[in-house]
């Protein structure tokens, strides 16, 4: 079965318009808007993974928050103790800023004003 060049060109000339005709009839223009609820399997899986990650980091977040609160309480207590030490009736009491304690000038021991 020998196909000559002229037969190939003739076949191509016949098939090309047919292919174009089919492609134009298959293509249809739609004006529909599809709105999804967002409740697809993929979005549910993503939400589950995010929740799992959030729960995994919960312990770390709690530790950071506790440490921050502890440091805040320590600074707040030191501020109150400094005020008490400076307003103390004891003339030998002084505030030591490095150790955040009220000390006796003579002995160096901690004083509770």
Curated annotation (Swiss-Prot):
N-terminal signal peptide: 1-28
Keyword Signal among record annotations: yes
Top-level taxon of origin: Bacteria
The keyword Calcium is annotated on this UniProt entry: no
UniProt entry keywords in alphabetical sequence: Signal
Family note: Belongs to the UPF0482 family.
HAMAP family: UPF0482
Protein name: UPF0482 protein YnfB
Organism: Escherichia coli O1:K1 / APEC
